[in-house]
Amino acid sequence: SETRCKKYLKELFVPMAEYFISKGMYVVMRPPGVCPHAGDTEDNRYLGIELGDSYQEFLLKVWDIVSQNAVVKNNPGIMFELANEPVHIKGTDGKYGGDGDACFINMQKYFQAIVDKIRGNACNNIIWVPGLGWQSQYSGYKDHRIEGGDIGFAVHC
């Protein structure tokens, strides 16, 4: 819930981040859980993510809250990892997948909306964008680039 997100951001995550930053460390914030995917639930209702789905709405809300926090916003010690693996998205061809042009077209749109939400709050923290699959597929970003500054990729080796 939005109330819970604000509560724990204020009472737990911000103080934790401030502590680690005071010790000379960097902090990467990421939303809880993983991207919905096949096998994620007992009824297997998810095949992946898709434009405009409830998970994108969730991410937009979380990052809107986080990127407006006075301590977090523009803090050079805090970076944002937009989402966690596995990332399978419904492509422009109507099929779910973890690679290929059809998936990267929608991947760019999906995460560009989140980047735009963060930047729209005048928040310029470094942003780590996930790749497709198990955060190991990035080739499509050369043609379907996430726009903006201070953007990198969350690569899992």
Where would I find each of the regions flagged by the language model?
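Extracellular glycoside hydrolase catalytic/binding regions
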Residues: L47-M79, A83-C157
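Aromatic-lined substrate-binding rim segments of carbohydrate-active enzymes
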Residues: S1-G39, Q56-I65, Q112-A122
